[in-house]
Amino acid sequence: MSIIYESEVPNPNTLFVRDPNPQICEWQGRKALQLSGQGASLLIVPDLHLAQGWIEVDMGADGAAYPGIAFRIMDSLNYELAYIQPHTSGQWDALQYDPVFHGSNTWQLYYGVGAQQHVEVPPKTWLHLRIEFQDQRALIQVGTQEPLLVNQLAHHHNSGLVGLWTFLPAYFSNLRFGDDAPDFLASMPLAGNENSLAVTVTEWFMEGFGVIQTEENGILNLNRYLPLSETEVRLVREVEVPTGGKFTFNVGFSDQLTLQIDDEVVFKGENLYQNSPKWEERGYVKPDQQIECFLHKGIHRLTAILKAKENFGFGLALNIEGDGYRLLPAHLCR
């Protein structure tokens, strides 16, 4: 095993640190680095880029927190991220893959198989997190528990820096990483996205920008294209109907949506995070809102007006059910 960086307690004075008050302290019988997690703390080891390899660290928290590992860091606003959640220990999201785009977390867009894993991660305990990655796949594991297998890492850049991350206070020790080719790939199945949604609209024309595409899971990730300062967009697509009939639009979104057909509002709704143990109240983007409309023969213009209210994922998923319709090319929308 080739180790290219190792530190019992990472020294914040020699690293890039986005944290107002990093501290070296004692926690659970061990010397540790404490990050405050105010506004999401990020520590980056400079000058060491990894395209493939492994990263491991011990971490823990006294209560609610999201301590994790950032990798393939392109800059302080764009990177791959995986973390544990001691306050949801044993639940479906106790281990979460959550790529960061333009400074926004996106876990409401990346969930389920390939993004979340049941693990036991109790508070007030040292826990070992390890990530192995190569190409667009990664294995993320807490101790010897069942690993999370990510078949499609979200970012397109294939190399970057390594760091630590947390929202809310957490403790870290024994950070090390290397660039050995991981051996998990031989036993990891090459599969499509098992969490892919049944969507029919995979391209949109975003006004003021151009044509954009959905992710592998069928969800449109607006954070990929927009900075946090852009909180409202208009998405357009045209559909041709050969004969009149009833159509069903199944839509999922985050955070607020107004859907128009030929400039007539057919749906308005809000889907926000709620601090709840219920899956359906977390604000995940899933096309489970149904709108039924009668469309006459001809070309109809769909307009989705989306507004962001949180930094957990800004996105849309749309599936159209009906006979004989045809989506016109997105680049023809103006």
Residue ranges and their predicted role:
Residues 258-303, 307-317:
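Beta-strand-rich ligand-recognition modules
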Residues 76, 171-242, 275, 307-334:
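Extracellular/secretory pathway-exposed regions associated with glycan biology
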Residues 104-128, 291-292:
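Short, aromatic/His-centered strand-loop micro-motif at the edge of beta-sheets
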Residues 141-161, 266-278:
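Short, solvent-exposed beta-strand-to-loop segments that form ligand-recognition rims
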